[in-house]
């Protein structure tokens, strides 16, 4: 018989990047008594991954649970970046409602639309939390109108349109149901969750069913599958059948060795859990996202949410430069292959395939440049050494044979004086200006529809054009007819002439030709790119050249050579910079840009063809 678990609420916190989801979860954890009063807690405690803490973004969805009065609230903190949208899509299957967090100043942004659309498609209950209302430039009433317009644009039904609004400052630790209410604590949000999010439903006596929505890993117990029990119960030592989501005919009987529920930031061992509980199971070696744990007697799979397809790809390959193998721990094609295919176990948005005709190269497809750059950064930190190519978009073909390309919706916030330059640059990259709105602080918000390939390599140029004051946010919109050719980099490269070590004298002579990426003492090799030429052509320079010494000295002492500090490129900047005939060499200690063909004579012949 179908019953409700009134003692449980399962919710996801969804939002655009940097609208304050993780800070909000921090405050809910603190005010629910999850931490001791004297316990020191890091800011954004849910962002446990090093890259997440450095960049201030959530990449992987996290599970936590709090108890408010007599109700256990399971909370999933999701990512707000479009490149990790696959994380959002699958974890929403575990919950009955969402808290949509929207910045009281920025309002509705591209990812707000994406995450809300996914929640409405699954018919989830929505609570709108307008966060950061303590900002001086906050405009909560206007943001309410923007959100209601978005609901209407997404064809929300009457029940969904009638969702409650909460106003909050997660940083200051309060939430209010009305802007005139006293600002004390988060209790209004707790009450709103308990009163408006439906309790999970299921049949406690039915056959066991649990969809695996995320995979965790622990070196002591191995792979850990996380999901919500839809029906029945799970017990330690229970024998269950795993039904593979790719092929439901593939089934395997396994035994549950450990069963956990969530409490605060910890997993808690439990002997048994019932429908509605979000749990973690271990002891199953080859469990994958999308698989269903079922009773042995009646194995019925739960349909898995289709994940949006990748839009960009890069080639990952063995590093074959003259400096190959000197800095990395894992350098062979087998190492790289195993690591890439292992990533597929936890990242459902990623695709990996071996490039035909080359056993040392792999085509890796993802949802955007950030998606792939985070994978590259993780591999670097783990000791891998490899090379990657420039990102390319993935084209589709319609039924008439027309070429289709991925299109992004871009929201660009820039100081008014730079808006003309940004409009010109994005228009050259086949962007179509959809709207232009003045916002507070002398900024203008530009809304563009632009091909994904038009944004490849643009962010560095954008930061230069806006003197670091611009913000660009994008979200995948769909596929449209090919918009025509785009000319990318307008500059050439300064290329090292020979193998050796860069010296001050050689760099001093080279710096007049353009902007250098390296300083003295760095190892270089022929074909390595050591700087940028402001003109379109590539120039070979000898940065290893030392000054010719004579046994006579000039009457005045040699003037000290002054070098301009080099421009050190970050991983994202380097990926933005490389052209189609170039590669980025990635090692745990260095990023080097190089030509695909290192030999200048062979390169010249290839360019003439």
What do these predicted ranges mean?
Residues 125, 135-195:
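Canonical P-loop GTPase G-domain recognition
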Residues 233, 285-286, 366-372, 415-419, ...:
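Helix N-cap motif at beta-to-alpha junctions
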Residues 1-102, 106, 146, 215-218:
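P-loop NTPase switch module centered on the Walker A-proximal segment
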Residues 321-344, 560, 564:
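A short, contiguous, amphipathic alpha-helix enriched in charged residues
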Residues 262, 267-270, 404, 450, ...:
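Long insertion/accessory domains within large nucleic-acid-processing enzymes
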Residues 41-44, 154-166, 200-211, 240, ...:
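Interdomain boundary/hinge elements
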Residues 169, 356-371:
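Short glycine/threonine-rich beta-strand-turn micro-motifs
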Residues 209-314, 324-326, 337, 491, ...:
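Conserved nucleotide-binding/hydrolysis modules and their immediate coupling elements
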């Amino acid at each position: 018989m179908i019953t409700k678990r009134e003692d449980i609420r399962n919710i996801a916190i969804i939002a655009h990047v940097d609208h304050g989801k993780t800070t909000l979860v921090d405050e809910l954890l603190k005010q629910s008594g999850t931490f001791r009063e004297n316990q020191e807690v890091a800011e954004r405690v849910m962002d446990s991954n090093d890259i997440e803490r450095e960049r201030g973004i959530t990449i992987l969805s996290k599970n936590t649970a709090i108890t408010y009065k007599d109700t256990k609230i399971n909370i999933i903190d999701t990512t707000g970046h479009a490149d990790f949208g696959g994380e959002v899509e699958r974890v929403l299957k575990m919950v009955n409602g969402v808290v949509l967090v929207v910045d009281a100043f920025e309002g509705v942004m591209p990812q707000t639309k994406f995450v809300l659309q996914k929640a409405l498609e699954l018919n989830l209950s929505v609570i709108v939390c307008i966060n950061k209302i303590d900002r001086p430039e906050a405009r909560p009433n206007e943001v309410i109108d923007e959100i209601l317009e978005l609901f209407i644009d997404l064809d929300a039904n009457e029940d969904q349109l009638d969702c409650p609004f909460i106003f909050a400052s997660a940083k200051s630790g309060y939430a209010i149901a009305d802007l005139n209410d006293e600002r004390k604590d988060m209790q209004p949000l707790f009450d709103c969750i308990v009163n408006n999010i439906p309790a999970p439903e299921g049949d406690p006596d039915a056959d066991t069913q649990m969809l695996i929505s995320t995979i965790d890993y622990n070196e002591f117990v191995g792979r850990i599958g996380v999901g919500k029990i839809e029906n029945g119960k799970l017990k330690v030592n229970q024998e269950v059948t795993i039904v593979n989501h790719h092929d439901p005919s593939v089934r395997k009987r396994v035994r549950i060795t450990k069963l956990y529920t969530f409490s605060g930031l910890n997993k808690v061992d439990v002997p048994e859990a019932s429908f509605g509980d979000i749990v973690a199971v271990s002891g199953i070696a080859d469990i994958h996202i999308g698989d269903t744990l079922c009773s042995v007697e009646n194995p019925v799979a739960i349909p898995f949410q289709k994940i949006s397809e990748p839009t960009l790809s890069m080639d990952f390959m063995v590093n074959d430069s003259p400096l190959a193998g000197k800095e990395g721990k894992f350098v062979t094609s087998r190492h790289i292959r195993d690591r890439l295919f292992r990533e597929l176990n936890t990242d459902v948005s990623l695709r990996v395939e071996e490039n035909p005709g080359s056993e040392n190269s792999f085509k890796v497809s993802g949802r955007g440049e950030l998606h792939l750059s985070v994978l590259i950064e993780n591999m670097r930190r783990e000791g891998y050494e490899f090379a990657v190519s420039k990102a390319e978009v993935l084209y589709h073909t319609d039924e008439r044979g027309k070429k289709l390309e991925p299109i992004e919706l871009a929201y660009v916030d820039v100081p008014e004086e730079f808006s003309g330059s940004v409009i010109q640059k994005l228009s050259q990259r086949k962007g179509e200006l959809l709207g232009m709105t003045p916002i507070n602080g002398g900024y203008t918000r530009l809304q563009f529809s632009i091909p994904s390939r038009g944004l490849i390599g643009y962010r560095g140029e954008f930061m230069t054009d806006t003197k670091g004051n611009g913000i660009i946010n994008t979200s995948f919109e769909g596929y449209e007819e090919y918009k025509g050719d785009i000319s990318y980099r307008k500059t050439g490269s300064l290329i090292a002439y020979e193998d050796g070590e860069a010296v001050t004298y050689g760099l001093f002579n080279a710096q007049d030709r353009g902007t250098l990426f390296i300083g003295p003492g760095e190892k270089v090799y022929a074909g390595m790119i050591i700087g940028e030429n402001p003109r379109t052509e590539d120039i070979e320079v000898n940065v290893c050249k030392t000054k010719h010494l004579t046994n006579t000295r000039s009457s005045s002492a040699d003037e000290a050579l002054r070098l301009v500090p080099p421009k050190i490129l970050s991983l994202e900047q380097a990926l933005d910079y490389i052209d189609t005939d170039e590669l980025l060499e990635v090692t745990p200690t260095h990023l080097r840009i190089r030509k695909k063909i290192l030999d200048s004579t062979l390169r010249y012949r290839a360019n003439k063809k």
